[in-house]
């Protein structure tokens, strides 16, 4: 088969290394990977065939730089991996494709709803998809009153900015957790914060941030990672997440969940999502929706990023993708670990 060139953005993100490795291990053709990142000291700079520095996704120079790289490298496919870049890429899909590639991204509307948790929760409120009860606040007074409406201080509540990557800005507001225990017995990264601590930070701040306050939901932490096309789920691995460290789960286990599959199918259909997405659930509650690839569990014979690329290039049909569902192995486990590379920086 013809050699394939893939432009992989955010080639230093936590899920990049296994995606690069799995694409390079494809047997039926040679795949050349061109990586981009905002930092030259990332794994992608060493594992990709070629590597280019880019500005941050919110920079006005980001899209022109991507176009420059596309015109230079002539990739067949652009595969985005970062929430910080996905809105810019979706908003400029036509420009990027005019430069000479196919872009694996959902519609601009679907991406913007997915990335804004206020819009996401509002969109699915009173739908078959459960979302936490929430309030959007922009002042200290609203924060305090909304926290009380959601059950604080008798029950903990959560908050985070409507736009944020992963666990950035996420905290659990609770006065029941010992500060002494957090300092002496927990890792330095703790989600818990008391109202007094919150007041110390924001009480005298003239510019109160936009925040989303949510009820504190509990249950098994799972994500679904469907490959979708035109609002339809073609196959959908579901994994539980364990052993979180610094905001990243370190272990994943492939599981079955008809309920989460049904919720994911409704999400995909309603938003008319495309390609690989990632939906995070706590119990039955949708917590986060990433309209991009996230950490994958690779099973023998099942390489979802490569399937998505072939589907985008019309080398396979949706039915052929559906047939691959039988290759999802329940119980297949992935453990994330730290590794190192060594190089001469001269």
What are these regions (language model features)?
Residues 1-36, 73-81, 129, 185, ...:
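Preference for protein termini
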Residues 1-105:
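ATP-binding N-terminal substructure of ATP-dependent carboxylate-amine bond-forming enzymes
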Residues 184-249, 254-263, 267, 283-285:
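Phosphate-binding site of ATP-dependent enzymes
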């Amino acid at each position: 088969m013809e050699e394939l060139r893939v432009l992989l953005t955010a080639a230093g993100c936590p899920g990049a290394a296994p995606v690069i490795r799995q694409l390079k291990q494809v047997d039926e053709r040679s795949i050349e990977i061109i990586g981009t990142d905002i930092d030259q000291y990332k794994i992608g700079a060493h594992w990709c065939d070629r590597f280019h520095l880019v500005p941050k996704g919110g920079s006005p120079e980001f899209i022109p730089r991507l176009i420059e790289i596309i015109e230079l490298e002539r990739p067949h496919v652009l595969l985005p991996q970062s929430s910080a870049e996905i809105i810019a890429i979706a908003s400029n899909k036509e420009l990027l494709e005019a430069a000479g590639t196919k872009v694996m991204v959902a519609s601009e509307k679907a991406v913007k709803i997915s990335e804004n948790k206020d819009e996401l929760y509002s969109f699915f409120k009173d739908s078959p998809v459960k979302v936490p009860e929430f309030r959007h606040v922009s002042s200290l007074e609203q924060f305090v009153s909304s926290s009380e409406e959601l059950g604080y201080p008798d029950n903990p509540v959560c908050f985070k900015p409507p736009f944020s990557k992963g666990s950035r800005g996420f905290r659990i507001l609770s006065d029941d957790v010992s500060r002494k225990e957090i300092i002496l017995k927990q890792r330095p990264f703790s989600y818990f914060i008391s109202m007094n601590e919150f007041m110390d930070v924001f009480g005298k701040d003239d510019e109160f941030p936009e925040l989303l306050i949510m009820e504190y939901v509990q249950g098994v932490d799972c994500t679904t990672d469907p490959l979708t096309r035109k609002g339809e789920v073609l196959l959908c691995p579901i994994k539980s997440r364990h052993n979180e460290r610094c905001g990243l789960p370190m272990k994943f286990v492939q599981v079955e969940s008809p309920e989460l599959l049904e919720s994911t199918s409704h999400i995909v259909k309603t938003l008319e999502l495309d390609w690989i997405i990632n939906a995070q659930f706590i119990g039955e509650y949708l917590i986060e929706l990433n309209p991009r690839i996230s950490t994958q569990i690779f099973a023998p014979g099942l390489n979802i990023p490569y399937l998505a690329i072939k589907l985008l290039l019309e080398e396979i049909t949706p039915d052929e993708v559906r047939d691959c569902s039988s290759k999802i192995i329940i119980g297949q486990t992935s453990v994330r670990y730290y590794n190192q590379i060594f190089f001469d920086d001269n």
